[in-house]
Structures are given as C-alpha cells and as structure tokens.
Design a protein with these regions (language model features):
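Small-residue (GG/TT-enriched) beta-loop-alpha framework at ligand/catalytic clefts
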Residues: 46-156, 160-164
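Glycine-rich phosphate-binding loops at beta-strand->alpha-helix junctions
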Residues: 178-207, 213-214
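Switch/connector loops and helix/strand junctions flanking conserved nucleotide-binding motifs
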Residues: 1-2, 191-194, 249
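Phosphate/pyrophosphate-binding loops at sites that engage ATP/ADP/AMP, CoA/4′-phosphopantetheine
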Residues: 29, 165-181
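Phosphate- and other anionic-substrate recognition elements at nucleic-acid/protein interfaces
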Residues: 7, 11, 164, 200-203
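Glycine-rich phosphate-binding/hydrolytic loop that grips phosphoryl groups
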Residues: 91, 208-253
Length: 253
C-alpha cells in the first residue's frame, strides 16, 4: 500500500525505520513487525504540504516459509521469492504490446478472490491503489456468467469501477499522464464474462486480458502448453523469470 508520512530526508527516514517507529505509526499490522519482511520506496515528496508518499510492502515470513516448503515437497528448489505485484510489473515492463504504443499509458488491474488492486507504473515506480470489496461482493463477481447479469452483480461491478475510475482520475490530475488502457490479471475462470461489464462502466478506457507472452516467440514443443484462453495467469511466473538472477554469486544480499 501507499502511505503518507511527514516529509523526511533519506537519513531521517532510515533512522525512523531502524527504530521501528515509522511503520508502527504509519501502518497497522496484525502481528509483530519482526514477523514480516518489509520493502519500502519513496514515491513522492511534497514540500508544499510537508508530506511524502511511501510504497510499503510487507510479506509475512511464515507465509514465505510455507510456500517454500510446498515447492520443496514438489521436488523443486526455491531460488527466489518476490511480491506478486512486483512480478507483474516485471512482466508488464518486458512485454512488447502490439496494441499499446507506450507501456507508460497503461495500468494493471488484478481481479481475484484474494487481491484486488490497480497498479499504475509511474517513472518505474508502481503506484498501487487497493480496491475494497466485501467477501459477498467477491462471491457475486465470481458467479458472473455470459449474458445479462443480475442487479446485485451489476451494482458490485459499478462500485468496483468507481474505485478504479477515482484512482485513475487522481493519478491523471497529479501527474498529467493519461491512462488509456488497463491490462487485467485474473485467475477467475469467468474473467472473460466480467470484462465487458467493466467496459460498460468505463467506456473511455480499454480493458484487455494481460498476455505476458505477447511478442514472445514460443518454441513448437511448448506451443500447446501456452495455448490457453487466459494467459494472464502466467504473468507472475514470467515476471519472476525476467528478474536478473545473480547466478555467479557476485553480490551478497
């Protein structure tokens, strides 16, 4: 999430982080801060309001260990763990879109039973806005099928679209950079039935399923494996693959 804090220099920020006082004051975590792996990045400093915006990402260490254990039980050796929104950014940055002139005028929207957020990449920095849904609303979205949808589901999509529209409007007003296209990432089986409702509510914005393999030459022996309707489900894995791995151990992390 993006949090707002009093304006600080890099040195002041680092001291506040080292004493744990910064995150305790800005972010309410369910557990002890030591139970998380924390990443942060300053997005914007505003001297007029004496504030700054910080991208805050916290991954629970127990979850990381659990996922690593699952991979090991499958006979795999985990070599890298990353936050999903960052892997999606990597995949987006490295995709050669045929229908988009510049990657800078598009955004990523994740729609799922778990996470729902809009990510706009500004100057190589992800600007993330959460979309707030109650569980019954998530259930209604997952039940949408082809054809007319019921009034309850339509109302949920309308509220969802309003949050997306507000996030885009805030970004465009602040940075004077128009967002024309949204790349949708989703593991929902009915996502192709959901997208038309978003297009209806946001008619001036293009919506399409994110295809991280667009522009990629796929060998014939892998063509069948990747010939699926919704390639956005591959985005996180491909984003990880784009990471520059330190295979020779030159750098110590």
């Amino acid at each position: 999430r993006v949090v707002t804090s009093p304006l600080m220099s890099d040195e002041e920020l680092q001291k506040a982080i080292e004493t744990d006082s910064l995150w305790e004051n800005l972010v309410q975590l369910a557990d002890n801060l030591n139970d998380y792996s924390v990443f942060h990045q300053v997005i914007n400093r505003n001297s007029k309001t004496n504030t700054m915006e910080i991208l805050f990402v916290a991954s629970k260490l127990s979850d990381v260990n659990s996922y690593s254990a699952i991979a090991k039980k499958a006979g795999l050796n985990p070599v890298i763990v990353d936050v999903k929104c960052f892997t999606l950014k990597n995949a987006h940055d490295n995709t050669k879109f045929k229908s988009i002139n510049q990657n800078t005028n598009s955004a990523i929207l994740e729609i799922s039973d778990d996470e729902n957020y809009l990510m706009i990449i500004h100057n190589n920095t992800p600007v993330i806005t959460d979309v707030f849904l109650r569980q019954p609303e998530k259930d209604l979205i997952s039940q949408i099928s082809d054809g007319p949808i019921n009034d309850e589901s339509e109302a949920v999509i309308r509220r969802y679209s309003m949050q997306v529209k507000q996030a885009i409007g805030d970004y465009e007003a602040k940075h004077e950079n128009k967002i024309n296209n949204i790349q949708v990432v989703s593991s929902l089986k009915n996502i192709n039935s959901i997208i038309p409702s978003f297009k209806k509510n946001l008619p001036t914005t293009g919506f399409s399923l994110f295809d991280p393999l667009e522009g990629v030459a796929i060998p014939s022996y892998n063509a069948e494996k990747t010939n699926i309707d919704n390639r956005s489900t591959l985005a996180a894995v491909i984003g990880l693959a784009y990471r520059k791995l330190d295979v020779f151990g030159y750098y110590k992390f």
